């Protein structure tokens, strides 16, 4: 499952993401009894000039901000930071951005009545104390126990979300709260900063390398002065209390329906530049298909990103997926298994505004009954030619099995079918700057058969697709899947599907 590594100088190395699925394309595009409607809301803990990014003072404020959506039948399906705030990434402006995905059932013409017994929940966010020293396997079991206890009271688990408290209040402006902040903040539109952050690109290195080197150098210098120890990913003395972990639930007034949660293996290979993670790799379907076949839903993930001061930097990261056993009254819960789609998506951020993300694909797949259940943000970063930040996110979607598609086994590898001269070119499954190209994803043209992600400004808050002259986008979200070459999904039964975006 996956592809080999392309050469650094490959001009066609432009994929902004990849899709992995247990189904072939015609099956992915088959409409089901139910479809979904999604609303994507962005929140920030800092001031933002963009009125569409909602300012909050705490994660807890999200509850009141989404109340009106709950009255309209939406619920929070996923919540995540835009980037994984690990180490010095906690000081980047984008680390204060959060995404909330709301969803509701959209009835198809086949079924014009709402499912019976459907209840309206309320959003609950509770603090879940967890220090960095407590991030062990024992702590993982403790977290699972906590959400299982809550589930017995009618609390349906949505996910964990952390908040790093910082004195900084500025998005892309001048920071007055310390040298480390001012060194790491980048002013949007500054040619000088864009040049400095893209020196790696101009010198033949990836723009991601430039980020890692700058973060590594600046944060290392600062920590050497403060701690006498360079680039420790552990928080400085006294900072542990500045990180809070929250648990998010959809709470029902009665406990007639309960859910059970269990953990599953999550292991990723990583490469680093210094102590900073630059790429990571995982066999997503191999890790998850077994659980999907059992009818479980992947709800969230928990990764031990940090390493303590003085510890050996591992070449792999461990964590766990959290799976849910569906309770009664859940549409499709009577089915014996789930099919899955996993998307490796580059999300582009301009200042405190998300410019390119998984939104268009999500809205397209929603029409075919695909439910987004979890988004795993990563600390893997790069910059585009305009100086905008890009981060890799892993998006998990599922749908109840409609046929014997779950007969696939998680140990089977997926193959990739490509036409033309790209047929013999391999692409990396690495989640970092796997293409290691010197050009940003949104400024290069994709091969016809690899188009899945629209332009950098393709999805507006009104749900419209727009074009951008530096990227091959799409005229409408309905065309996203149709742009895929049929050959990419034309594989023998029982093999997981892979395509590039």
Swiss-Prot record:
GO cellular component term of the entry, any: plasma membrane
Q: For the modification Phosphoserine, which residues carry it? A: 405, 430
The alphabetical list of record keywords is: Cell membrane, Lipoprotein, Membrane, Myristate, Palmitate, Phosphoprotein
How is this protein situated with respect to the membrane? Lipid-anchor
**Where does this one sit in the cell?**
Cell membrane
Which Pfam families does the record match to this protein? Raftlin
User: Where on the tree of life does the source sit, at the highest rank?
Assistant: Eukaryota
Q: Where is this region: Disordered?
A: 1-20, 196-239, 407-449
Is-annotated flag, keyword Heme?
no
Q: Which gene encodes it?
A: RFTN2
Name by which UniProt lists this protein: Raftlin-2
InterPro entries hit by this protein? Raftlin (IPR028169)
**What the protein does?**
Upon bacterial lipopolysaccharide stimulation, mediates clathrin-dependent internalization of TLR4 in dendritic cells, resulting in activation of TICAM1-mediated signaling and subsequent IFNB1 production. May regulate B-cell antigen receptor-mediated signaling.
What is an annotated GO biological process for this record, any one?
Answer: response to exogenous dsRNA
- The PTM Phosphothreonine maps to 409
User: Which family does the similarity line name?
Assistant: Belongs to the raftlin family.
């Amino acid at each position: 499952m996956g592809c080999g590594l392309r050469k650094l100088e490959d001009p066609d190395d432009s994929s902004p993401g990849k899709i992995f699925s247990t189904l072939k394309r015609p099956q992915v595009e088959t409409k089901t009894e139910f479809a979904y409607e999604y609303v994507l809301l962005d929140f920030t803990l800092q001031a933002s000039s963009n009125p569409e990014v909602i300012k909050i003072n705490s994660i807890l404020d999200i509850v009141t901000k989404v109340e009106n959506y709950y009255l309209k039948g939406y619920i929070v399906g996923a919540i995540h930071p835009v980037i994984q705030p690990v180490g010095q990434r906690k000081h980047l402006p984008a680390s204060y951005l959060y995404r909330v995905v709301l969803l509701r059932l959209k009835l198809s013409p086949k079924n014009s009545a709402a499912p019976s017994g459907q209840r309206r929940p309320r959003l609950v966010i509770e603090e879940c104390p967890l220090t960095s020293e407590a991030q062990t396997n024992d702590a993982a079991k403790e977290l699972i126990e906590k959400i299982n206890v809550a589930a017995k009271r009618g609390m349906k688990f949505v996910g964990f979300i952390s908040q790093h408290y910082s004195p900084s209040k500025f998005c892309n402006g001048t920071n007055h709260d310390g040298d480390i902040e001012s060194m790491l903040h980048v002013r949007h539109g500054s040619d000088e900063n864009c040049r400095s952050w893209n020196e790696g690109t101009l010198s033949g290195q990836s723009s991601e390398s430039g980020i890692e080197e700058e973060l590594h150098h600046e944060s290392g210098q600062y920590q050497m002065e403060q701690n006498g120890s360079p680039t420790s990913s552990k928080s400085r003395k006294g900072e542990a209390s500045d990180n809070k972990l929250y648990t998010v639930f959809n709470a029902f007034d009665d406990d007639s329906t309960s859910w059970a949660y269990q953990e599953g293996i999550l292991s990723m290979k990583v490469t680093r530049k210094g102590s900073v993670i630059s790429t990571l790799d995982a066999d997503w379907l191999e890790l998850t298909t077994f659980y999907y076949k059992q009818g479980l839903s992947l709800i969230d993930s928990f990764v031990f990103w940090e390493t303590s001061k003085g510890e050996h930097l591992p070449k792999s990261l461990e964590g766990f997926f959290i799976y849910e056993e569906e309770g009664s009254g859940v549409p499709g819960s009577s089915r014996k298994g789930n099919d899955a789609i996993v998307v490796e998506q580059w999300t582009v951020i301009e200042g405190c505004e998300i410019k390119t993300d998984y939104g268009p694909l999500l809205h397209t797949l929603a029409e075919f009954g695909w439910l987004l259940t979890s988004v795993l943000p990563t600390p893997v970063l790069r910059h585009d030619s305009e100086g905008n930040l890009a981060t890799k996110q892993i998006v998990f979607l599922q749908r109840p099995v409609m046929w014997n598609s779950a007969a696939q086994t998680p140990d089977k590898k997926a193959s990739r079918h490509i036409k033309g001269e790209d047929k013999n070119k391999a692409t990396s499954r690495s989640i970092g700057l796997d293409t290691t190209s010197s050009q940003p994803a949104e400024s290069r043209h994709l091969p016809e058969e690899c188009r899945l992600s629209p332009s950098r400004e393709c999805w507006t808050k009104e749900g419209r697709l727009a074009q951008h002259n530096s990227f091959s986008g799409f005229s409408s979200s309905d065309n996203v899947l149709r742009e895929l070459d049929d050959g990419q999904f034309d594989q023998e039964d029982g093999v997981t599907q892979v395509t590039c975006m």
